[in-house]
Design a protein with these regions (language model features):
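Radical SAM enzyme [4Fe-4S]-AdoMet core and its adjacent flexible, acidic
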Residues: 1-75, 79-88
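Flexible mid-to-C-terminal extensions adjoining Fe-S/redox cofactors in radical SAM and related proteins
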Residues: 79-149
Length: 149
């Protein structure tokens, strides 16, 4: 996953072909009856989604999930890049319930609406633009896409 410091270490990230090889491996082990699953990461496209997981992935950041960082900042998920627009408040100065009900708009709007590539994708209604933790907030596009590579 190209998030956090991994963004600076391109040579260590799996290539698209290596990621597909890993997903093919997981699919094969599941077909053999091994209880292996691909974790919470991003939508894998209809080719892989139900083959390597028990159900379709949808990023729940800011919808069902909130996180409080060590400094008190309130965000949607600890894996999401810390930026002014992703920090929704601070537990030491803000009421959590009010933050939850009145903020988090950035996470309650489909990422697909922000990206032309995603908006035009046939799988957009399933993917919703992917995960917030792998979203490029400057370029307004997903860093990882299995739908429309």
């Amino acid at each position: 996953e190209p998030i956090g410091r991994a963004l600076e270490l391109e040579g260590y990230a799996l290539s698209d072909a290596e990621q597909r090889q890993m997903l093919d491996f997981i699919r094969a082990r599941r077909q053999e009856g091994y209880p292996v699953t691909y974790g919470c990461s991003h939508f894998l496209g209809l080719t892989y989604e139900r083959e390597v997981r028990d159900w379709y992935f949808l990023c729940n950041a800011g919808i069902y999930t909130a996180s409080i960082m060590a400094n008190g900042d309130i965000g949607a998920c600890l894996d999401i890049e810390r930026r002014p627009e992703t920090i929704q408040g601070n537990i030491f100065r803000d009421d959590f319930k009010q933050v939850w009900t009145e903020r988090f708009e950035i996470f309650r709007t489909s990422l697909a609406e922000q990206s032309k590539k995603c908006a035009e994708c046939a799988q957009q209604r399933y993917c919703e633009g992917g995960s917030y933790h792998s979203w490029d907030y400057d370029r307004k596009e997903q860093r990882i896409c299995f739908c429309n590579p």
